[in-house]
Amino acid sequence: MRVFVYGTLLAGESNHGWLKGALNLGRWTTPPLFRLIDLGPYPVLSPGGRTAVTGEVYRISRLILQRLDVLEGYPGDYQRRLIDTPWGRAWVY
């Protein structure tokens, strides 16, 4: 499975360690279909806007996905949905 990350989960950012063991497939920019909401230290990606978001796509295990769910407060604070990427469908929070 795959995950698309942006913000604090990117390589070099404060929460990137949560992706330990994941394989970076590459950098990618979404189509301009989102809104990126600034909540201070944590950006939120929301559907229905006109913004393209640049991030990274990783191949992850089910265990890493479960860890990311804990970090993101899913279910609860964040939603998790599938988006299409050049490497196939990927989860995004």
Segment roles from a protein language model:
Residues M1-Y93:
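Glycine-aromatic micro-motifs
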